[in-house]
């Protein structure tokens, strides 16, 4: 029995390690996706099905439902249900388990996938809650089915919780570790908080786009977007609230900026958008759409409060006939941001100075 318990725990931990190792391998052969997680966890479930835990030489305790908890938490109902059906069919037709148990696996898959993504607790607690739900389902089964009894369920409860907690701790710990590795690898290009390009990448990109615009005789525009009163958010509510605002602001910008243009967080509360081959009118209209969108939006803080914000936007613009100077377009946009701030904030300004 001890060997079986060790095997079950080892299979789950090894599966979780393999999940992270392939995802973060140097060659990046495997790309993270819900389908990839489903395949891996289905294989883990089948390995658990092949080696159930014997109890008193009378019972065989199956822990094949535990990988379904991870799928219910980290994927969706479609993926979880596919995995549950595959595991149930193998349990019934390959390993001779009862048809009723196969149905229960599918029911567990459906329920945990309905509940898992919406649990507000951290991942470890959420997985323990999903395990408790699964045990309750099996307990109900033992009451109404002669194939299972309370003794088997009583043994299943501590074993399943040990497996779930050990697997969850391993999963979260490795996730945090490899997330730090990814952050270190990407810190030269990306802002870790918003996922947007950082100021270093902004400089490289602006220089590159400026050269293309010069070579192709195209216009070049730059929007510098500054959140009004952002310091007050940090001072009044906390830096955690400020981070939440920055994340929401980055998502809002993604919704308004056309896909062909890149968005950057230059640092602090300043964002930028590099635009090529747009007219001045188009560039200013885009800036005004962003300003209006922010003004109409509500920003949700971690303490459940909702606040309103505004942005000041400076537009730097070089026409087709202008020499595409990276420094000039940045200076023009930066000067216009300061003018917008001095003119009362929540405005779009560009040169020649026109207020919208």
Swiss-Prot record:
Molecular function in Gene Ontology: diguanylate cyclase activity; phosphorelay sensor kinase activity
Main subcellular location of this protein, as a coarse class: membrane
Entry-linked InterPro entries: Diguanylate_Cyclase, GGDEF_dom, Nucleotide_cyclase, Rev_trsase/Diguanyl_cyclase, Sig_transdc_His_kinase_LytS_TM
UniProt entry tagged with the keyword Nucleotide-binding: no
Membrane topology: Multi-pass membrane protein
Keywords noted in UniProt: Cell membrane, Membrane, Transmembrane, Transmembrane helix
Transmembrane segments: 2-22, 35-55, 76-96, 99-119, 124-144, 152-172
Cellular localization per UniProt: Cell membrane
GO terms under biological process: cell adhesion involved in single-species biofilm formation; cell wall organization; negative regulation of bacterial-type flagellum-dependent cell motility
One Pfam match: GGDEF
UniProt-listed NCBIfam families: GGDEF
Protein name (record): Uncharacterized membrane protein SH2145
Organism: Staphylococcus haemolyticus (strain JCSC1435)
